[in-house]
Regions:
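Donor nucleotide-sugar binding/catalytic pocket of nucleotide-sugar-dependent glycosyltransferases
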Residues: 59, 77-80, 156, 160-210, ...
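Short alpha-helical donor nucleotide-sugar binding micro-motif in glycosyltransferases
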Residues: 104, 281-282, 289-294, 386
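Short hydrophobic beta-strand element within catalytic cores of glycosyltransferases
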Residues: 319-322, 332, 339
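N-terminal subdomain of nucleotide-sugar transferases
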Residues: 2-78, 380, 411-424
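Aromatic "clamp/platform" in nucleotide-sugar-dependent glycosyltransferases that forms part
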Residues: 302
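Nucleotide-activated donor-binding/catalytic signature segment of Leloir-type glycosyltransferases, i.e.
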Residues: 266-288
Length: 424
């Protein structure tokens, strides 16, 4: 059976006067899969359960030995699915409208929350609408942007139209950053709102810096370690971070670059760059230790909806270079708590990386301010935001009220007709 560690409760299970919701969550990726969507959703779900809500989660089966992991307030339904090409550790769910409809009829959730936009997510939208259950959706991944990195750029428009059609059939689309809200409005999305992300600042903490780990990397306490954490994949624009590091080496030949993560480009990049340190996938305390043991964090991706690693690097006390959008634009100030080159400006990214790599005092100063900002990004705020949206759109607060109003209006019409008939 899969382990499913519970984070520390963020609040009492039930707060007097606060509504408790039954939520059907539909996702094509979930713990223990390692990606930003699975990681943040797992935390959100656990926090909602700890706050007393009833969560019914639908997801594809993750291998033959996978099994449900129910507990009080949380149940799973495993669905049929298939591996995603080039991402063998991830799956998409098959269409399953009839199965979902049967479960929705039986459970009658207050709201259906669709997290991913694959065939399973689309089936959930259709099933919920057929039954008159309010459905909300998340925009968490820029799939249409990925097409440019896999030589199928022609498909970008098709994917973009598919995503817009799906989301516009839901009551509201939730996304983690304000600049993405504005971008989606420009694309024709109807109703979009920010629900941001939180970070565990006790787990990701500068105190996790480990000199023995740095020794394994072949560096002393003063040598510069440039860090990348994330998927080793084309859409992460990872080769720009390597290019920036090579520029650093021209003035600082003792610098080291450490890359944490797995992905389809890992073997290729490792063979091309034998002097770089590829650590593979790290989780929990090990991941926190790797973050805190670095000095300068590079994140050149241009396909993020948020970028959870930015918050993790901030909390870990690292100097940070990232393009000015998504999480970096939401929480960091250029020259104050990070260096933020303009979106897609490759030379700016390299120049700022070199500048900050040569200024240890400034690096520590901006890292401290980034850490302070990360302290405000609590998961409790995220849970409260979701509760507010569930209150606004759920069947218990919204749909039934509309039905009641329609009934009242109908009775008024009947009464008016009766009065007219009596008058004649």
């Amino acid at each position: 059976m899969r382990s499913n560690p519970k984070p520390n409760p963020i609040s009492p299970a039930r707060i007097p006067g606060r509504r408790i919701f039954k939520v059907a969550v539909v996702t094509e990726t979930y713990f223990p899969e390692i990606n930003g969507v699975a990681k943040t959703l797992h935390r959100m779900v656990n926090d909602l359960v700890d706050r007393g809500h009833d969560i019914l989660l639908f997801r594809p089966r993750q291998g033959l030995k996978d099994s449900v992991n129910d507990r009080r307030g949380y149940r799973e339904v495993l669905m049929a699915g298939c591996r995603i090409p080039m991402y063998s550790d991830m799956r998409f769910g098959f269409p399953a409208k009839r199965i979902l409809k049967r479960h929705f009829k039986k459970e009658r959730p207050d709201i259906v929350h669709v997290v991913t936009e694959g065939p399973l997510g689309w089936s959930a939208v259709r099933a919920a609408r057929d039954l008159g259950i309010p459905v909300i959706s998340d925009f968490r991944t820029n799939f249409h942007s990925y097409t440019e990195y896999y030589k199928v750029g022609f498909a970008g428009k098709v994917v973009g139209n598919y995503l817009k059609r799906l989301h516009n059939r839901t009551a509201i689309t939730l996304t983690p950053s304000q600049d993405l809200v504005e971008d989606l409005f420009k694309q024709g999305y109807d109703n979009v709102r920010v629900v941001s992300r939180g970070i565990d600042t006790d787990l990701f903490h500068p105190s996790k810096r480990d000199l023995s780990l740095r020794k394994e990397w072949g560096v002393n306490k003063d040598q510069l370690v440039v860090l990348y954490v994330g998927r080793i994949a084309a859409e992460k624009n990872i080769e720009l971070s390597i290019q920036a590091f090579r520029k650093i080496q021209e003035s600082n030949p003792n610098a080291k670059m450490v890359l944490v993560g797995e992905g389809p480009l890992k073997d290729t990049l490792e063979n091309k760059n034998p002097d770089l340190i590829f650590c593979g996938l790290k989780k929990g305390e090990e991941l926190a230790k790797h973050y805190a043991s670095g000095d300068l964090f590079l994140f050149p991706s241009m396909t993020e909806t948020f970028g959870n690693v930015v918050l993790e690097a901030m909390a870990s006390g690292l100097g940070l270079i990232a393009y000015k959008y998504a999480a970096a634009n939401s929480y960091l100030e250029h020259g104050v708590s990070a260096f933020l080159p303009g979106f897609g400006k490759k030379q700016e990214f390299i120049d700022m990386t070199c500048f900050l790599s040569n200024n240890a005092v400034l690096r520590k100063k901006i890292a401290a301010k980034a850490r302070k900002k990360a302290m405000d990004c609590t998961w409790e705020k995220v849970a409260q935001s979701l509760e507010n949206i569930y209150s606004e759109y759920s069947i218990s607060m919204n749909y039934l009220e509309e039905q009641a109003n329609e009934k009242i209006n109908f009775l008024r019409i009947v009464e008016s007709r009766s009065q007219i008939e009596r008058a004649f």
